[in-house]
Amino acid sequence: MRLSTIKLSGFKSFVDPTTLHLPTNMTGIVGPNGCGKSNIIDAVRWVMGESSASRLRGDSLTDVIFSGSSARKPVSQATVELIFDNSDHTISGEFASFNEISVKRLVSRDGNSAYYLNGTKCRRRDITDLFLGTGLGPRSYSIIEQGMISQIIEARPEDLRVYLEEAAGISKYKERRKETETRIRHTRENLDRLGDLREEITKQLAHLQRQARQAEQYQALQEERRIKDAEWKALEYRGLDGQLQGLREKLNQEETRLQQFIAEQRDAEARIETGRVRREESAEAVAKAQADVYQVGGALARIEQQIQHQRELSHRLHKARDEAQSQLQELTQHISGDSAKLSVLREAVAAAEPQLEQLREDHEFRQESLREAEARLADWQQRWETHNRDTGEASRAGEVERTRVDYLDRQALEADRRREALVNERAGLDLDALAEAFEQIELRHETQKTSLDGLTEQVEARKHALGGLQEQQRASQGELAEVRKQAQAARGRLSSLETLQQAALGQEQGAAVAWLKSRGLDSAARVGERISVQSGWENAVEGALGQLIEGVLVDAPEQLVDALGELGDGRIALVSSATDNANFAPTSLAAKVQGPIAIRRLLARLHTAEDLDAARTLQRSLPEGDSVITRNGERLGEGWVRVSRSGAAKQGALLRERQIQELRTQIETLQEREAELEHQLASFREQLLAAEQQREDAQRQLYMAHRSVSELAGQLQSQQGKVDAARTRIERIETDLSQLLETLDTSREQAREARAKLEDAVTLMGDLQGTREALESERRQLTDARDQARDAARGVRDAMHALALTLESQRTQIASLSQTLERMDSQRGQLDTRLEDLVAQLSEGDSPVETLEHEHQAALSERVRTERALGEARTLLDSIDSELRSFEQTRQQRDEQALAQRERISQRKLDQQALVLSAEQLSAAVVKAGFVLEDVVNGLPESANPAEWEATVGQIDGRMRRLEPVNLAAIQEYGEAAQRSEYLDAQNLDLNTALETLEEAIRKIDRETRGRFKDTFDRVNSGVQALYPRLFGGGHAYLELTGEDLLDTGVTIMARPPGKRVSSISLLSGGEKAMTAVALVFAIFQLNPAPFCLLDEVDAPLDEANVGRLANMVREMSEKVQFLFVSHNKATMEAARQLSGVTMREPGVSRLVSVDLEEAARLAGAA
């Protein structure tokens, strides 16, 4: 394989499309410094995949695009194309059948870069893979740039090793090893994650096993409690039925008494209605008298205000008259001064206007002269540009024709060679076989893709279903956690309240408790536990009862009076537990309390008020011996006041008892909800396990389908690329053959025409030189005349502008003064008018004030009369109000009695309803527990005590609380976790097996790499030892390994020129280093010759003798390797079979000029 053509367009200084043909194996590029020779080497490196801007001598990759020059604009993109002759099939694989391979790269200003392989767009990696193992690449040993020859010899051992690896062809092994290491790393990461999961599952299994055993015990206790609780509720239901019968009889008696109170109340209401009519008539008389008083008082105030206003008005008028006279005098002075200024300004404007007109005429004359001079100069400039354009066109035409002649000659030779190569390549392309293989792969791909679509939809559906179940499970788990948290908080609160309640009710006093226990009363209820108080009145009841709140409820307290003598110390109160639905006064505290009748009677003569003010008012109207109490416990009686404040432990016992009952109800509700949620979670876990298994199965099938589709897609893309490349190549060959035939016919004709045009252009340029000198002399004369006219016009214009500015300023002042005088004349007229008005008002005098004084005295007399009439009307109204209050008090008493009776009846009905509701709740609870109420009641003995069953339920609850918190789902969770553990163990085994396979692959790659590297090292070392004496005319050089491990050991080179003993390569001279590096590079080429070698001024540090040795070596190796070198040395140029010159006649733009030395020599010999 060899490089046949390099095409550049827009790359660095090669802005125009440029083609460099390389027909021989020894091509030299020559030219002056800075003309762009090294840009050709950069172009080859760039198109082969170089991605570092610094290695291309730029700051960014877009710097390779031509950025413009003094005569050219920047271009938008750069393109480089390499065409390889692959007739020896050096490139294997899918491109082995192509005799010609094209590699192209394009980059635009927006940074987009694209690669093309045989006209088909591809990746950068495809280009890199194409040249793997050939010794070619953007940074391979086949491209040696300026200064790089010394860098090779001074490189670190690790960097020098890279060249040997490329020569050994193990770069592809390193790439595979890197991919395998990445897969091993991912596998180990998966193993680590899997190990963490297995460790966590193991911990969960031990924990869940303990929870499962605890859950089984808890469920057994739940079943036992369900039976006992149903029996306990059935016993309570049986007791409630007897209470309902007695309550109905008492309700009938209360309704009869209510009818009597209502009749007496209606009689009092009729008397009140008659009194209200009389009161309304009296109230109207009082309102009329009051209105008369208000009317007279208003008139009196108005007269007094008018008198004060008249006096203030007279003072303001005197002050305004004095101010107006002062302003009129000052305004007259201003008018006189401004009139004088206005006359002076008008005279100055009249004198300046003729002068300005004269300057304008002079300025117009000067401007006309300047325009004529500039027109003559513009005419000359047009002729000058025409001359320059003619000269440039003639010069460019000559250069173009000269270049064209050279190009057309080379084009004819190249077209004939390419025609022969294209014919041979077309014969080797089999398009039908490639197309048939493509159709087979495409059919398999479409079939697998259809299956993949179905599997994808199935996986998505199962993921969606699994996500919905997980979301529902999380919501239920969150709600369950919250319910448990609320229940735990409620139990803690209940325990605290019960402890406080025991202390508040005196259940912790030692002597009293012992006395009660000796009589079987230690578990008897306390007063605070059995009374119900209207909300807000708890403090008042506690203050009123005092120590009685701790009283023990017994059936007959009088029977225990004698036994109280046995109480050694402490205190105790015994209260009858009997209850009664007796009605009490609505204002009494007893009306706000439900409980033992003894407590209610104690509170019957204690009335209630919202606050102290209301209490004081109510206390004055109470019968003797009654007292009143507020919500806060402040108590007032006749001649005494008492405030009782309980300690922290005693305070709020009644309110606390209500909270205890509410908490017990709340806990029962939460426990029911907890059981429902646990059952719901168990169902979700079963569904999730099944859904997860289904999703994993579908995911596994989808993965296998994806893998199959990807492999087929890769095969399809590869085969499509082959078909497209072959088809494109055939079309291109046909087109190229047709074009080549036309090119051969037209090139000779165009060459004859170009030579004739070149002679005409040279003649024309001689004629134009004389015209140029005459035009330059005329330009100097016209420029001087134009400058004189411009200076004269500028002086006149400046004087005219100065005078115009002065005149405009004076006119502005005249207009301003005129407006000011008009405004001040108007103000003076207004001041005269105002002064006359003020004098007229002052002349009227003080006559209105005397009239107002007389009206004031009459109004005072009228006010005395109306106030006397108002007093008489109010006396009559007070008498009627006294009678109404008496009637109202009578009606209110009957109303209160009726209200109290209604409340008693309502309370009876509420008690009845409460008993019915309690019975229904008990019945519903038994049915909910799964029992029939009648069967449970009939199955219980008559002597059964509900308290015993309640205690049994409490004991079971205690055993259950000791087990809490309990995870009832632990039984199922334990089974699920065990299945998950088995699945993870299987995955762990699969991953370990895959890891062993990958590690074996690494070991195999390492063995192959070591063998290839050792063989290459030995052969290159032998080559260096043979080539070094030839290049130096003696001496000795060899390679050394820096380490023992052939996988990563570095490589150093040791050299000793003839007659020298050096200990380090750094002690060599620049030329010696260059020759040593050349020996190394050529030794590598002998082992694994790259298709071509690019040398950029490697002979720069060498003397003439060494240059000759280098040239001979290059000439000898060119039999197998194609060389393209850049040089300024004549001896190196002489070794070349073809020289291509790079010129930069146009600044910033490089062009090629090619010469075939053999052809030139042959033509010279023939002549």
Curated annotation (Swiss-Prot):
The keyword Cytoplasm applies. It holds the Pfam family SMC_N. It is found in: Cytoplasm. Keywords: ATP-binding, Coiled coil, Cytoplasm, DNA-binding, Nucleotide-binding. One of its GO terms (cellular component) is chromosome. Signal peptide: none annotated. Residues 170-274, 310-390, 468-500, 653-870, 982-1011 form a coiled coil. One of its GO terms (molecular function) is ATP hydrolysis activity. CDD domains: ABC_SMC_barmotin. The keyword Coiled coil applies. HAMAP family: Smc_prok. NCBIfam families: SMC_prok_B. Required for chromosome condensation and partitioning. Belongs to the SMC family. This is Chromosome partition protein Smc.
